[in-house]
Amino acid sequence: MNRLKATIVLSLLAAAAVAQETDHHETQHTIECEARVASPQVQAARRVMAGGPLSLQTCRDMALGYNKTLASKRVQREMAAQMRKSARTKYLPSLDVMGGAIFSSREISILNNTQKSTLKNIGTSLGGLLGISDPKLQGTLNHLGQDVVDGFRTNNRAMYMASAMVTQPIYMGGAITAANNIADINEKMAAVNEELARQNTLQNIDKTYWTVVSLRHKLNLANSFLQLVQKLDDDVQKMITAGVATKADGLKVSVKVNEAEMAVTQVEDGLSLAKMLLCQTCGMPVESDITLADEAASTIAIEEDSVNGADTVAYWYRPELELLSNTVDISRQATKLARATYLPQVLLSGGYLMTNPNVYDGFTRKFAGVWNVGVVVRIPVWHWMDGTYKVRAAKAATTIAELELAETQEKVDLQVSQCSFKLKEARKKYAMATKNVDKAEENLRCANVGFKEGVLQTTDVMEAQTAWMQAQSQKIDSEVEIKIAQVNLKKAIGHM
């Protein structure tokens, strides 16, 4: 019995272990599935929560997911798609159902009062004309006359009507086709507007990202410069104690230390503000403590240009040009729409009409109806040249749109040329700044050696340190200038 109990206990423990392991595997599988299906925005948010560095692509994904303008453009594109679907329905037949009730103070009379009086007294009148003196016969004829009057009664003081009508456009002068073309173009424009908002968002986030990176590198530079002048200050203080330097030399270096500390504070403030802007653009709390992937690098990586500013065919990637081209197309369709208003229009209609009283059965108080089919033709004849004026105005709008498109093409050409030129100039500045850094480092090394040997003054060392800092700062500026110039060139060509 004890052995049986032990066996049962072991079996239960094994089953519990298997169940726990199964739950663990299921949980792990669920987490892996969620990670696979997570959007780039969710993955970026998790990375921020984990405290990891944010890459440029991560910031891009977060900005695209958060940007309100871009979200609005997506809704506008969906709205344009619904309007296009609405325009398609104009080709199809439409069914309308109507009903009504009318209560009148008087009913329609088919007989006038004289006819009613004659019919009511027809027996008396015929008796006088034919010499019939039998009152019973006259009364019978009068009663028959009253029945005739009652038979002509419409009894329509209360009228009820219901109808169902189907209308099919046959020819509307091209208005339906033009309206559908306009709806198609509007949907394209909505998509282009969304792309334009996307490119603007990417341009802004790229500029902000590289601004933060440059300020981080400048902060590192400012701290390095502060360490240099602090070391010089320590050396000068020791020399003053040893009697080989004057107090004036120490004051000069102290002023330089204060300036370096002020520079560090200014760069820290600028870096904090730039990070606030980056966090706001990415949809994070502005006080978030973020770290960018390119901050840790000693230098900003300079990549080769991925676009060619001389590629004029690529200019048509610009959403602005595509929008203006669509505007020209819409104005042309608007001309057709204005012309269609004054062309013949043909409609096919059919339906069923039901009324009470029944006009097809002596106005009896019951519902009855009739089927009907017809063709409606509308031909404008004379409207004092109104259609001609509207068509001319629409053509003038097309001309204006074409001129705006041509002017914008010229401006885009100029913008691309300017961005390409600025990129080349930025690369030249970077090459010169790199050479200046090498020379400044050598100059600083020689100044330190000369100062230790006693052949150079503290002012010479401070000048060398200042020149080194300026050279390093110019190099950082040129690196970021290349990055921003590349972003601007991509935006100018439309390759964001």
Q: Where are these predicted regions, by residue range?
A:
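Short segments within alpha-helical structural elements
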Residues: 32, 259-284, 437-495
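Sec/SRP-type N-terminal targeting helices
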Residues: 71-75, 88-89, 153-156, 170-198, ...
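Small/polar, glycine/serine/threonine/aspartate-rich low-complexity segments that form flexible
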Residues: 40-51, 98-164, 295-304, 336, ...
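Bacterial Sec-pathway N-terminal export signals of envelope proteins
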Residues: 20-109, 286, 292-329, 409
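Periplasmic alpha-helical coiled-coil/stalk elements that build and connect Gram-negative outer-membrane
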Residues: 26, 54-58, 82-84, 192-313, ...
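Bacterial Sec-dependent N-terminal signal peptides
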Residues: 1-24
